[in-house]
From Swiss-Prot:
NCBIfam families: ispD. Its EC number is 2.7.7.60. It comes from Prochlorococcus marinus (strain MIT 9515). PROSITE patterns: ISPD (PS01295). CDD domains: CDP-ME_synthetase. GO terms for biological process: isopentenyl diphosphate biosynthetic process, methylerythritol 4-phosphate pathway. Keywords: Isoprene biosynthesis, Nucleotidyltransferase, Transferase. Catalyzes the formation of 4-diphosphocytidyl-2-C-methyl-D-erythritol from CTP and 2-C-methyl-D-erythritol 4-phosphate (MEP). It catalyses: 2-C-methyl-D-erythritol 4-phosphate + CTP + H(+) = 4-CDP-2-C-methyl-D-erythritol + diphosphate. The gene is ispD. Pfam families: IspD (PF01128). Signal peptide: none annotated. The lineage of its organism: Bacteria, Bacillati, Cyanobacteriota, Cyanophyceae, Synechococcales. This is 2-C-methyl-D-erythritol 4-phosphate cytidylyltransferase. It comes from the Bacteria.
Length: 223
């Protein structure tokens, strides 16, 4: 299985002053732990990191253990552009791909394998968790307009897996139509293509705040 890891986190909300994937987490960089989990998945055979050129040296230095096993890919101005660059940098024999956020360092390798296996039967799959909070839809002035049934609500995570041919087609359509999305599954939705949900777990958080970092430290103490 081929895996692409967008790794251009600005670290603004972390107040880090650098790419948040370089933040120290139990003696290693955040991206180190992500790669450790990804390479622990037995079905993974190729990994590409998509980042900004000015981060390349520092990011690769922080994951020297994996330096011979990863490919560097220059990213674009947005996550969407970066993933498209990644798709165009895959080996010619790549038929399926998993896209995984660099900041989700607590991903369980078994869930990575599960996503890969589900692509045997589906064109697109994503990890997600059932929403447990009551969700409110509000207007621009902050007034509640609707309370959707949470039984039908899931919080999207990564990995998100796709047939390479279909995902590339979706990205090309997005360029043509000027669609802007925050995850790749949204492109399939806009094209009315099916995406299969795979239930993930609540520990697969995306590190976006100092609190998230403290939570990750607690999980990694026994890793």
């Amino acid at each position: 299985m081929h895996v692409l890891i967008p790794a251009a986190g600005s670290g603004r909300r972390m107040e880090a002053g650098k790419n948040k994937l370089l933040i120290d987490l139990e003696g290693e960089s955040l991206i180190y732990w992500t790669l450790k989990s990804v390479f622990s998945a037995s079905l993974v055979s190729w990994v590409g990191i998509i980042g900004q050129p000015n981060d390349k040296k520092k990011l690769l230095n922080s994951v020297k253990k994996f330096s011979n096993e990863i490919e560097w890919i220059n990213g674009g101005n947005t996550r969407q552009e970066s993933v498209f660059n990644g798709l165009n940098s895959l080996p010619s024999n790549a038929e399926k791909v998993l896209i995984h956020d660099g900041a989700r360092c607590l991903i369980n390798p078994d869930l990575i394998n599960k996503c890969a296996l589900e692509l045997e039967e589906n064109d697109a799959v994503i990890l997600a968790t059932k929403v447990t909070d009551t969700i409110k839809i509000v207007d621009n002035e902050g007034y509640i307009q609707q309370t959707p049934n949470r039984q039908n609500l899931w919080a999207a995570q990564t990995p998100q897996g796709f047939l390479v041919k279909k995902l590339r087609e979706a990205h090309e359509m997005a360029i043509e139509k000027n669609w802007k999305v925050t995850d790749d599954a949204s492109l399939f939705e806009m094209l009315n293509w099916q995406v299969r949900i795979i239930e993930g777990n609540s520990s697969n958080i995306k590190i976006t705040s100092p609190l998230d970092l403290q939570i990750a430290k607690l999980f990694l103490k026994d890793y």
